[in-house]
Amino acid sequence: GSPAPEFELTTPDGKKLALKDLRGHIVLIDFWASWCGPCMDEMPNVKAIYERYHARGLEIVGVSMDNNKSNWEKAIERAGLTWHHVSSLKGMNRCPVAKLYQVVAIPKLYIIGKDGKIIAKDLRGEELREKIDELFEE
């Protein structure tokens, strides 16, 4: 896989989080937004994966395409999403990280290996679960 583009964005509480901070972990990057129905539909699946593998080193970074901070925070809280969250709060067309990862539609997910390289992208549902299962069996 090619190296995952490096980025740093802001968390809801104003801290910075960079992808390189999570090196050494398998990282799932989930591009989503509070206004995206299919994204919210996929969350229970992402949540199940997180609950199963976080203790074994899986990290998830939700990169939100929201431009309204309050909507973003409410969606995180309502859906009970306890992993890392970041956003530029510039929306999909102006988010620099969306450009880096060629995000033109969401949800879009990337799996990044411990070495910082892209393992897979665009998996959802059962396919996503199977791929994560496989990575943790190795």
Q: Which residues make up each language-model segment?
A:
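Hydrophobic, well-ordered secondary-structure elements that form the walls
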Residues: 29, 72, 85, 116
